[in-house]
């Protein structure tokens, strides 16, 4: 059954109540512009020994306009470079997309935490869902999310893709219904 929380503080309390000593994965999903990154970073600031892993670091730039949102990300690389090591209690490093060059470059340092927050529209899709301890949907009306996304991306190459991305998000939500599969729903507006 899906639980609703009102604030990030409520979400942090819920995570702490469920968190155990083993590695713990919180997955935060929502449509583009919903506020996923904001919720993820605010949550991580409230939790001891946590780190945020944005799925945008795993975008495949050449696939950003592919019809299916799932094809925009290299989810198998998330599993290989992050989740396998993390769930074994090992420190990890991964390669992120450098937007300027289109190349994969190592992140600075090594992540050695007991909780990670995966953040992105596909954060609890296969194969990632098998590793997720708590799934969170950021519920934001489509028009609000799209407006935010356009404002955020103003002046970048991404601003021109929002019409396509909005349709892709709508298709993804209709097919996969992540908001119905989430353990927790939090308002993003």
Predicted features, each with a name:
Residues 1-26:
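Extreme N-terminal, non-catalytic leader segments
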Residues 31:
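P-loop (Walker A) phosphate-binding loop of NTP-binding proteins
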Residues 36:
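Conserved lysine of the Walker
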Residues 39:
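Hydrophobic positions on the alpha1 helix immediately C-terminal to the Walker A/P-loop
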Residues 44-53:
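Post-Walker A helix-loop "phosphate-sensing" segment adjacent to the P-loop in P-loop NTPases
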Residues 51, 60-110, 115-116:
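Conserved nucleotide-sensing/catalytic segment adjacent to the nucleotide-binding pocket
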Residues 103, 125, 154-189:
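Small-molecule kinase domains that catalyze NTP-dependent phosphoryl transfer to phosphate-bearing small molecules
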Residues 104-152:
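ATP-dependent NMP and nucleoside kinases share a basic, alpha-helical "lid"
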């Amino acid at each position: 059954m899906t639980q609703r929380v009102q604030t990030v503080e409520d979400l942090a309390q819920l995570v702490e109540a469920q968190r155990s000593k083993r590695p713990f994965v919180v997955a935060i999903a929502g449509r583009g512009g919903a506020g996923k990154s904001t919720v993820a970073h605010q949550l991580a600031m409230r939790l001891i020994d946590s780190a945020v892993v944005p799925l945008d670091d795993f975008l495949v730039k050449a696939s950003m306009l592919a019809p299916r949102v799932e094809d925009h990300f290299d989810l198998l690389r998330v599993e290989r470079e992050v989740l396998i090591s993390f769930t074994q209690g090992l420190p990890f490093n991964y390669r992120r997309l450098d937007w300027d060059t289109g190349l994969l470059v190592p992140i600075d340092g090594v992540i050695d935490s007991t909780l990670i927050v995966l953040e992105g529209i596909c954060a609890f899709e296969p194969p990632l869902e098998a590793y997720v301890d708590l799934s969170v949907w950021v519920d934001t009306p489509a028009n609000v999310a799209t407006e935010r996304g356009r404002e955020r991306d103003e002046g970048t190459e991404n601003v021109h893709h929002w019409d396509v991305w909005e349709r892709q998000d709508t298709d993804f939500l209709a097919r996969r219904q992540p908001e119905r599969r989430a353990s927790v729903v939090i308002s993003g507006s």
